[in-house]
Amino acid sequence: STRVRSSAASDVYKRQACAGGALMDLGVYNVSYVVGLFGSPNKVHYAANITRGIDTSGVLTMEYRSFKAVSINAKDSSSPARYIIQGTKGYLLQKSTANFCGGVTFHPYKGKEEHFNLSAGRPRQAAEFHAFARAIESEDMELCSRMLDTSVAVSRVLETARRDAGIRFTTDL
C-alpha cells in the first residue's frame, strides 16, 4: 500500500519479529466487519503470500453454515476498497474501507437501487464515539460485554487464520 511504501519504517513490516503482516495489520478491520455482522465463523482458512515469514498479502475465507465470506488483505499492492454482501434478493455495495462505513447502496435484482448513508457530513468516527459515550453514561455493561465478546471472536479468527497459513510469531509457544 502507499502507506507502507511511504513510511520511514517500511522495513518494519518485513521483519517477522514485529508480527506486522497484512492479516494482523490490515485484516483486523475486515475480520471485525464480518464478525460484527455475522458472528464467529465455523471454519477459517488463510492463503497467504509469505515473504521472510510475514504475509505481505492473502485471502481469508470464513465459512458460515450457509455462506462464505472472503476478505483480501494486501501490503504489497493496493486497490479501491469495496465491500459486497450478496444475497438472494440483491447485493449491498459499500465503497469505503471497513473501518469507515460510509454510504451503502442496495442493488436489488428486481427494482430500484436504494442508497443509505447514516454518517453523511459527520466526522468519520462520530457515530462510534457517540455510541461509546452513551454506553459509558448509561453504564451499559451488556453492550460492553457484547463488544468484548466480539473483540475476542475477532482475535480468535485472526489467530486461527495466521496459524493456518503457517505464520509463526517469535512469541508463539
Region annotations inferred by a language model:
Residues 134-173:
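C-terminal helix-rich "cap/oligomerization" subdomain common to oxidoreductases
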Residues 117-130, 146:
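Active-site loop of classical SDR/Rossmann-like NAD(P)-dependent oxidoreductases
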